[in-house]
Amino acid sequence: FDHIFAEHQNTRLIIATFASNVDRVQQIINSAYKYGRKVVVEGRSMVNIISTASALGYLNVPENTLIEIDQMKNYPPEKMVLITTGSQGESMAALSRMAADVHRKVTIQPNDTIIFSSNPIPGNEKAVSKVINELSMKGAKVIFQDVHVSGHACLEEVKLIYGVVRPKYAIPVHGEYRHLTAQKHVVEDLGIPKENIFILASGNVL
């Protein structure tokens, strides 16, 4: 996790993982402490397991690192990391409620970075994709480990095509919203002005 924290020091981090993966939670807490971030734990199972693991000595939380969710407003977003349930797209999990704008305490912001720190269990792919797309539509950056899609152009091939064609305008097509957003970021990095890149829904007229 260290490289993710190092590369995203100006955004709020929201990390979804299995509550039972105490070792992963420890890694997140260690990185948060290293980079001077406060940690909020959200999701009932996550809160319960972290509390139990800490009490039994399986989890080491540095003093003054863990705060309550109501205290988030006292800190700038870039000094916060939320560890949350919902990595499998469960409809009532904390991250799913954030994505659907029905979470009472957390509102997704365009500058947020959300990390899915687990691959979807077979059968959950559709639910996970739905949450990722909802988060992307809110302008948040989503980091998802399972990025391989067989038969599609890889990142360097996409860069090559844009480098050869050098278009004035770009309209990413063919993919879910998160794929279009990812291509948009690539195009921006290649020097095409943000105002010349359009993500359109079916039926939109440009």
What are these regions (language model features)?
Residues 1-206:
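Acidic/His-rich, metal-assisted hydrolase cores and their charged scaffolds
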